[in-house]
Amino acid sequence: MSEKKNKKEKLAEEIEQEELNSLDESVETVEEEATEETLTEEQAKILELENKLDEVENRYLRMQADFENVKKRHIADRDASQKYRSQSLAQDLLPALDSFEKALATTSDQEEVKQILKGMEMVYNQILVAFEKEGIEVIPAVGEQFDPNFHQAVMQDSDENAGSNEITAELQKGYKLKDRVIRPSMVKVNQ
């Protein structure tokens, strides 16, 4: 009886061991499947996050480039503003300068008028010096070739002593501020 009992116990132990082994295998299989599913889900999440990161990095780089462009444009605008700051004042003073030139072109025998003209000439010269300090200069005209960038042709001439397209007379002086024309010269051009 004890042998039977031992056999039964051994058999029960073997069955129990087999069930445990079977359960272990099932658990391992389930764990492997779960791990594979988890890995696949995690890889998908990683891929999604990497794509989002790339997108954010690209947006950041574009924004940084835009910022640099705005910065450069601002510097260029500021430099141009500084360079041409006196343009508006010069444009406002040009009619007065023209009036000075017309007044100085008159002559008189009266001593008082000569003194006034001398004072006006001094003021006129001071304005020219101030213009020169700001980079404002007269556009050369008579004897030069006509250039539509600097001259405005208002009359034509037929002078045999002048070359073709040469300026023969200046009706109104032109001025430029550094490389920018403030007012073109009004000229008479030979055919």
Swiss-Prot record:
Task performed by this protein: Participates actively in the response to hyperosmotic and heat shock by preventing the aggregation of stress-denatured proteins, in association with DnaK and GrpE. It is the nucleotide exchange factor for DnaK and may function as a thermosensor. Unfolded proteins bind initially to DnaJ; upon interaction with the DnaJ-bound protein, DnaK hydrolyzes its bound ATP, resulting in the formation of a stable complex. GrpE releases ADP from DnaK; ATP binding to DnaK triggers the release of the substrate protein, thus completing the reaction cycle.
Stored HAMAP family: GrpE (MF_01151)
Residues covered by region (Disordered): 1-40
Highest taxon of source: Bacteria
Species this chain originates from: Listeria innocua serovar 6a (strain ATCC BAA-680 / CLIP 11262)
Pfam families reported in the protein's UniProt record: GrpE (PF01025)
SUPFAM superfamilies tied to this protein: Coiled-coil domain of nucleotide exchange factor GrpE, Head domain of nucleotide exchange factor GrpE
Protein name: Protein GrpE
Subunit structure: Homodimer.
High-level lineage: Bacteria, Bacillati, Bacillota, Bacilli, Bacillales
GO biological process: protein folding
Localization (cell): Cytoplasm
Entry's family note: Belongs to the GrpE family.
Keywords: Chaperone, Cytoplasm, Stress response
GO cellular component: cytoplasm
Single annotated GO MF: adenyl-nucleotide exchange factor activity
Annotated Acidic residues bias: 14-40
Positions with biased composition (Basic and acidic residues): 1-13
